[in-house]
Amino acid sequence: MTIEKTFSIIKPDAVKRNLIGAIYQRFENAGLKIVASKMVHLDATKAQGFYAEHEEKPFFNELVEFMTSGPVMVQVLEGEDAIHRYRELMGTTNPENAACGTIRSDFALSMRYNSVHGSDSPESAAREIAYFFTEDEICPRD
């Protein structure tokens, strides 16, 4: 298996409900190491830049409004097959369809307030990590 990095956001709805520790425990229980982490409060410009690929979609403004509504936790996760493993751990975007025991089935309130974000490919992981972290902020844990 390949050791890879992926990017994760714990969204404002989950931060507000004090779920950071519970979600971090899920990462570690799944064999994913947290190699970078920080709390940030996105402004509109930063959120719009991060979600630029969705700019033409009807939900874009609501997404930006939500992501700027409170602090978020951004982190880099590392492990074997980290991107796929984290996607499975998150569950589907719609928590009503998420498998039992996934982060979204257990913590998400709705499709809009779905608690977490995760990269969907190696390319998006690299782009998203670089958007929030410098190389010096990532601390490999061998």
Swiss-Prot record:
Keyword vocabulary terms for this entry: ATP-binding, Cytoplasm, Kinase, Magnesium, Metal-binding, Nucleotide metabolism, Nucleotide-binding, Phosphoprotein, Transferase
Report the GO terms under cellular component.
Answer: cytoplasm
Q: Which InterPro entries has this protein been placed in?
A: NDK-like_dom, NDK-like_dom_sf, Nucleoside_diP_kinase, Nucleoside_diP_kinase_AS
Under CDD domains, the record lists: NDPk_I
Q: Active site at which residues?
A: 117 (pros-phosphohistidine intermediate)
EC class of the enzyme, as a word: transferase
Q: Whom does it interact with, and what assembly results?
A: Homotetramer.
| Descriptive protein name | Nucleoside diphosphate kinase
